[in-house]
């Protein structure tokens, strides 16, 4: 058995064919012609040692961190870009100063920039009771807002009830009137009495309180009239009140039930509105705004007289 460090008998000898010993082992002249590269005089070939090998090339470092030369823009292009950026910066600074100047002018004139935030899914109006109304008036304002939403709910249900009556043969005129009530009633209530009350609570203005009282009385009268719905316009069936409900319950039970529900909604809205105007009037008198309003009215009358 061969030892671990014995030579391999099948391994080829590491012999340099150009050495003298290799020529001696070959036993004389080779039997083949070398062609154009054959040298008859082997002494002209430089001698090499028998154990010499070809020296390997030195290892080259891997070019992982090598940089790639990227041609940079010329100094002229850099200057042009720098000028362009400076011009843009100057334009932005000019716009910022102009916007700041307008905001300051609006603030001096008492103009408040309001961001639309309600309803959340489709902002149409600015409404922020928590941050804009004093804490001791927020409960009153929330109830007034509930009365505004209650009016919208009443008019919407009125459209449903009148539509059911129209389908059962009561005529299209009452349906058109119900649509007019809804389309004009909700925005009109917001502009005529809810927004004045909101601004009066926020700014504590006696004049805006007076406007609210004047319009809100008509709102209460309309709710009471709608709850009764006397046969004044088109037999009163354009409003879901108690009288048309009694008349329709005998003809069609479903339509009569719709009208009775409308009657209940208008009753609740009337009671809620009466509570709101009572609370607002108590605050108005208790805060001295009533006396202030009287003084302002007297001054206005005297100026008009002179």
From Swiss-Prot:
UniProt subcellular location: Cell membrane; Cytoplasmic vesicle, Secretory vesicle membrane
Record's compositionally biased regions (Polar residues): 44-54
Domain of life where this protein originates: Eukaryota
Residue ranges annotated as Cytoplasmic topological domain: 1-141, 278-306
Function recorded in the entry: Probably involved in membrane trafficking.
Disordered: annotated span: 1-60
Gene expressing this chain: SCAMP1
UniProt xrefs under Pfam families: SCAMP (PF04144)
Record protein name field: Putative secretory carrier-associated membrane protein 1
Coiled coil regions in record: 72-109
Record's keyword annotation contains 4Fe-4S: no
GO cellular component, one term: early endosome
UniProt keyword annotations, A-Z: Cell membrane, Coiled coil, Cytoplasmic vesicle, Membrane, Transmembrane, Transmembrane helix, Transport
Transmembrane segments annotated in the record for this chain: 142-162, 174-194, 209-229, 257-277
Stretches with biased composition (Gly residues): 25-36
